[in-house]
């Protein structure tokens, strides 16, 4: 993608029409792409289970949690079971890099370049960096880019920097030992380059180490995202490598409260369009995104998409929107959800995503139970302070209505939008008890106590939706995807 060009936000979101094809007859384009990667997908949703106890596994921390749900209710389990792990993921990765979508092969694209920057997800995301980085780096070096001129940037956004141990986990021990791997630091303004403003007025500060490189690559994965519709691609540029001033605007009520800035919404999502424009300004050249399958704590690769950033991401989103979409005919009386286990449920800050994913399918006045381990507690210091100092969701929303945006308020704002609609219950054993009173819902010491509270006073035969992997399933009422 070349430098410059008009700042017309409508130019960056063309072709993301995601209205699903019938489940038994996917689009020919999607099936052709799937077949080339060695798999065929088919979606299925589990029907109701009536009036008997049910043993269910939930993604929770690294090991999961198996719970017996009480009899007397209509359970509907929503699982993205149709994403099948690739039989030969290494070959699929090689093929994606050598036969990319709407782009020359990566090695050809890198020829003549003197430096490269690769943006990768931080420890809170299960991106398959360890599998993809070695063949990607090999092609850059084969094209003539010296190893010392390749920088791997961990796209932390406003998250904390990665520890040395985490860098090895993120990139793999060999890559971490032999290559330059550094964390983005959003608060260090001097480490960013100002690229101007977007058409809507967002000031764009992007990590200088990314912008100054000759070749700009992102490596991520695609899943439903609570504000952006779907993750991956442009998100690895901003907010991943953006400065604090940029991130605050992207997470402001301007975008947070837009009805189209939600899971599964992309074609007309204003935040998606904003990030595409920012990625264009930063000269985003090449993308590698994976779609992940489920596997009781493991997230094996289901598909690989590489190439020109917009075209490759569009193909990936089409795939994910098919295999992760699960629908209900009507809203549920209650929902049991998770934050998809490790690493997404490391902190309560990240675990909020499991609650927002459930909010779209619960009745007004219904109940949501979140199961999240939260071994690292609350999250960042700013989020912890906000949570501790705002025991009322209503007062919090009133206070931020006119005030300047502060770091991490957006996650609490998303939680408040849910608690205004539904009663939220929590089993979050890693969260210090001092925060229980500030959760805008009741926390319980055991999962059994939480489930008992969820089902108490519900009438016999009440409809309870169960989402064992929380935000990794795009749960909707009817065919609401692609708005």
Show which residues each predicted segment covers.
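Glycine-rich phosphate/diphosphate-binding loops that line cofactor/substrate pockets in enzymes
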Residues: 101-117, 142-148, 326-333, 362-363, ...
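Short, glycine-rich nucleotide/cofactor-binding loops
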Residues: 122-129, 340-350
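C-terminal non-catalytic interaction/assembly regions of soluble proteins
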Residues: 141, 351-483
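Short, low-complexity intrinsically disordered segments enriched in A/P/G/S/L with frequent Arg
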Residues: 2-9, 14-15, 21, 31, ...
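A glycine-rich helix N-cap at a beta->alpha junction
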Residues: 167-192, 392-407
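N-terminal amphipathic/basic leader segments beginning at the initiator methionine
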Residues: 51-96
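Conserved, well-structured core segments that form the ligand-binding/active-site neighborhood
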Residues: 177-198, 202-327
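Short glycine-rich or small-residue beta-strand-to-loop segments that form or flank ligand, phosphate
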Residues: 115-126, 151-157, 218, 336-338
């Amino acid at each position: 993608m070349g430098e410059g060009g008009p700042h017309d936000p409508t130019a960056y979101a063309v072709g993301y029409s995601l209205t699903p094809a019938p489940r038994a007859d996917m689009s020919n384009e999607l099936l052709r792409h799937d077949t080339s990667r060695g798999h065929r997908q088919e979606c299925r949703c589990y029907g109701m289970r009536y009036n008997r106890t049910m043993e269910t596994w939930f993604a929770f921390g690294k090991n999961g949690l198996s719970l017996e749900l009480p009899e007397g209710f209509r359970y509907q389990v929503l699982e993205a079971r149709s994403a099948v792990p690739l039989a030969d993921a290494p070959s699929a990765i090689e093929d994606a890099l050598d036969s990319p979508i709407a782009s020359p092969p990566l090695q050809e694209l890198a020829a003549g370049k003197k430096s490269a920057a690769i943006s990768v997800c931080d420890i809170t995301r299960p991106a398959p960096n360890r599998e993809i980085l070695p063949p990607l780096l090999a092609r850059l070096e084969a094209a003539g880019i010296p190893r010392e001129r390749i920088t791997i940037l961990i796209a932390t956004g406003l998250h904390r920097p990665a520890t040395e141990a985490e860098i090895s986990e993120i990139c793999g021990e060999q890559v971490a030992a032999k290559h330059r791997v550094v964390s983005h630091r959003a608060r260090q303004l001097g480490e960013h380059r100002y690229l101007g403003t977007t058409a809507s007025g967002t000031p764009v500060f992007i990590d200088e180490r990314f912008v100054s490189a000759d070749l700009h690559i992102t490596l991520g994965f695609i899943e439903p995202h609570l504000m952006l519709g779907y993750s991956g691609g442009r998100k690895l540029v901003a907010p991943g490598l953006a400065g604090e001033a940029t991130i605050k605007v992207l997470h402001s009520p301007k975008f947070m409260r837009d009805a189209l800035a939600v899971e599964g919404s992309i074609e007309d999502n204003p935040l998606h369009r904003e990030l595409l424009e920012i990625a264009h300004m930063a000269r985003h050249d090449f993308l590698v995104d994976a779609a992940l399958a489920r596997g009781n704590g493991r997230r094996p690769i289901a598909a690989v998409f590489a190439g020109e950033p917009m075209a490759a991401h569009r193909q990936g989103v089409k795939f994910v929107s098919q295999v992760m979409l699960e629908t209900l005919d009507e809203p549920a009386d209650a929902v049991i959800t998770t934050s998809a286990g490790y690493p997404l449920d490391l902190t309560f800050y990240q675990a909020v995503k499991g609650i927002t994913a459930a909010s779209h399918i619960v009745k007004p006045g219904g109940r949501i139970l979140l199961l999240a381990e939260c071994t690292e507690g609350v999250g960042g210091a700013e989020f912890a302070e906000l949570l501790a100092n705002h025991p009322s969701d209503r007062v919090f929303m009133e206070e931020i209505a006119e005030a300047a945006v502060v770091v991490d308020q957006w996650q609490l704002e998303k939680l408040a939008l849910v608690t205004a609609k539904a009663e939220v219950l929590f089993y979050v054993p890693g969260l210090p008890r001092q925060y229980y009173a500030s959760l805008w819902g009741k926390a319980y010491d055991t999962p059994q106590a939480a489930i008992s509270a969820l089902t108490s006073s519900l009438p016999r035969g009440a409809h309870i939706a169960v989402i064992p992997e929380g935000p990794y399933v795009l749960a909707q009422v009817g065919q609401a995807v692609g708005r």
